[in-house]
Amino acid sequence: MTASPSKLAQLRELSVVVADTGDYDAIKRLQPVDCTTNPTLVKKALDLPVYADLLERELAWGRAHGGDDRTTTVDEVADRLTIGVGVKLSALVPGRVSTEVDADLAHDTQATIAKARKFVAMYAERGVPKDKILIKIAATWEGIEAARQLQLEGIDCNLTLIFNRAQALACAEANVFLISPFVGRILDYYVAQGQTPASIDEDPGVVFVRTVYNAFKQRGSSTVVMGASFRSTAQIEALAGCDRLTISPDLLEKLDAEHGELPRKLSPGNANNAQITPIDSDSFASGLAADPMATEKLASGIDTFAKDLHALRKTIADKLAG
């Protein structure tokens, strides 16, 4: 008797599966289409033997090129390591690697554009074309405006920390390639408020992603919806059929070990060519202001990403000094 396919195998038939990790061996084993990275994942990756040569090479570069401005040297080594990890991962996945622009720049459109262009150039110097990468940017108004310009230059962007309909619609109106609504962090907020959902269909993170997905498909938007920040396989299963789902290795392993039917929960349905309503900075700001959850989670998400980047830089500074 033939064993039934795992839920992960079934999910691959419904959604593009993305690995939320820089763990080389995990990606090799789980074979996602894409992968996403951030400073914390890069920092963890550098402890793995497979990245030892990269780490030593870039630290040697830092020592050789370090002048009086130590901060600039550390920042440059952090960028080189981030791109180095991405280059290695790009050889493993058939799709794309998301690489995060500094969270410190979340409210600076021009600086975000400059850093994105730098990352694309660094990848190109290492033989990775821009169609193999996504530039990950926090979905502030300034970040979305940066993505609007980058998309016009042919640089595809992943707008992250999406918690609110205004953010999502602004991204679609800007023709952003992909957005990452954060399922788990939305749930976390409401659970902390004593509002634990009675069922997975009432999970506010799941409901939000379903709402955004359906709105985009009904309006004929080409912006990809990639559910992110999952707390359980139940959340993932509830979004089966979403364009893409970025999932941590531990949850991918659980899905790979589970069997039983995995039904499609989302489908394009009768998509039409209706237009996304333009959103300006005032309506964007008012949309966020009316949503305490989104306001809190966007701010705390940027703060967490910034702290993670500073932790990566501190690790590099300590190693350069050692």
From Swiss-Prot:
It catalyses: D-sedoheptulose 7-phosphate + D-glyceraldehyde 3-phosphate = D-erythrose 4-phosphate + beta-D-fructose 6-phosphate. Pathway: Carbohydrate degradation; pentose phosphate pathway; D-glyceraldehyde 3-phosphate and beta-D-fructose 6-phosphate from D-ribose 5-phosphate and D-xylulose 5-phosphate (non-oxidative stage): step 2/3. It comes from the Bacteria. CDD domains: Transaldolase_TalAB. Keywords: Cytoplasm, Pentose shunt, Schiff base, Transferase. Its main location: cytoplasm. Signal peptide: none annotated. One of its GO terms (biological process) is carbohydrate metabolic process. It holds the Pfam family TAL_FSA. GO terms for cellular component: cytosol. The active site is at K136. Its EC number is 2.2.1.2. Gene3D superfamilies: Aldolase class I. It is an enzyme of class 2 (transferase). GO terms for molecular function: transaldolase activity. It is found in: Cytoplasm. Transaldolase is important for the balance of metabolites in the pentose-phosphate pathway. Belongs to the transaldolase family. Type 1 subfamily. Homodimer. This is Transaldolase. The gene is tal.
